[in-house]
Amino acid sequence: MLAIVGLTGLGLKLSFLLTMISGGQIFFAIFLVMMISLILGTGLPAGPTYIITAIMCAPAMLQIGMPLLIVHMILIWYSIDSDVSPPIAVCAMAAAGIAKADPMKTMFTAWKYSKGLFILPFLFYYRPLLLNGPWLDVIITIISCTMGLIVSAAFLERYLHTKANLYELALLGLSSLLLLWPPLFLNVLGLLFLGIVSYSQKRRIAKERRSGPVEKPQLAVP
């Protein structure tokens, strides 16, 4: 595979296309790298996927102004994602075989639960998540990003303290985005929305306890 990339000039062509299609916009460049890594990862393990994406994508990412450390952390992170991404999802398929579970259901459940993998590489660039900034910014980033990922999991499962209604689900989705995005005032706004949902659900739980049994969460078993 590496010989094909080198002899055909595919690496240089893809690097040029990545720069051209993204228009030099870093957000779109990271998104395109995610898609390339996802496609390569359907048939290759993490190591070869990283090597090939580094050959094909790293020059273009450096050319549009991304730091070297962040470029390779993004490529490594998305390469790891190949193990749980359909349609191959090697790790999920192995787990399904061990558990004697439905392979397709296990694969898509693993993909759903690993959604944080898709978000974190963007944070590597837009936030000091790699500990390359002032210590106060790093602490705020770690706390807000951790909260954002927890809230995004609650959004995907439609469950915080109890099952979320449509209004609460919308607030959870908005809260997770605001907690992950850089400006501090947006993080505070995200916490406010999370507090509203938490208060609303706790009130509903208290009301249900007075009138009947509380709804229990359903575990997603592949």
Language model features with spans:
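Alpha-helical transmembrane segments of multi-pass membrane transport proteins
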Residues: M1-P222
